[in-house]
């Protein structure tokens, strides 16, 4: 299945990423190769192979929930480039401000 440069550009735009035309072409080629390799799995005969949902033997090991002291706010904020009313201010990712 061929992944086009237009598809890569579309996903990049949705992700707020910018790539050069050369990078977009390289991503399209690489993603096409990855999808082709995954599609090879459809050719594997899995008849009679039991369904596997978890390969790890560790299931739901729980520990006691113990409160621990947090970080010193002033010390953390020394590395923050921009803050507002006690919160870290980050660039907006929604053009219209969103529905929140």
Curated annotation (Swiss-Prot):
Top-rank taxon of the source lineage equals: Bacteria
Q: Which reaction does it catalyse?
A: L-glutamyl-tRNA(Gln) + L-glutamine + ATP + H2O = L-glutaminyl-tRNA(Gln) + L-glutamate + ADP + phosphate + H(+); L-aspartyl-tRNA(Asn) + L-glutamine + ATP + H2O = L-asparaginyl-tRNA(Asn) + L-glutamate + ADP + phosphate + 2 H(+)
Known EC number(s)? 6.3.5.-
Question: Is Hydrolase among this UniProt entry's keywords?
Answer: no
What biological-process terms (Gene Ontology) are attached?
Answer: glutaminyl-tRNAGln biosynthesis via transamidation; regulation of translational fidelity; translation
Q: Which InterPro entries does the UniProt record give?
A: Asp/Glu-ADT_sf_sub_c, GatC
Which keywords does UniProt give here? ATP-binding, Ligase, Nucleotide-binding, Protein biosynthesis
Q: Name one GO molecular function term.
A: ATP binding
Q: What's a Pfam family this protein contains?
A: GatC
This protein's assembly is summarised as:
Heterotrimer of A, B and C subunits.
What is stated as this protein's family in its record? Belongs to the GatC family.
Q: HAMAP family annotated for this entry?
A: GatC
Known function: Allows the formation of correctly charged Asn-tRNA(Asn) or Gln-tRNA(Gln) through the transamidation of misacylated Asp-tRNA(Asn) or Glu-tRNA(Gln) in organisms which lack either or both of asparaginyl-tRNA or glutaminyl-tRNA synthetases. The reaction takes place in the presence of glutamine and ATP through an activated phospho-Asp-tRNA(Asn) or phospho-Glu-tRNA(Gln).
Protein name in UniProt: Aspartyl/glutamyl-tRNA(Asn/Gln) amidotransferase subunit C
Q: Which organism is it from?
A: Streptococcus sanguinis (strain SK36)
Q: What does the organism's lineage look like at the top?
A: Bacteria, Bacillati, Bacillota, Bacilli, Lactobacillales
């Amino acid at each position: 299945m061929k992944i086009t440069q237009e598809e890569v550009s579309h996903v990049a735009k949705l992700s707020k990423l910018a790539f050069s035309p050369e990078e977009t072409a390289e991503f399209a080629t690489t993603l096409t190769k990855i999808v082709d390799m995954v599609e090879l799995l459809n050719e594997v005969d899995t008849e009679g192979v039991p369904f596997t949902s978890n390969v790890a033997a560790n299931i739901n090991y729980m520990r006691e929930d113990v409160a621990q002291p947090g970080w010193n706010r002033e010390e953390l904020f020394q590395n923050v480039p921009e803050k507002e009313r006690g919160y870290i201010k980050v660039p907006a990712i929604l053009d219209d401000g969103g529905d929140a």
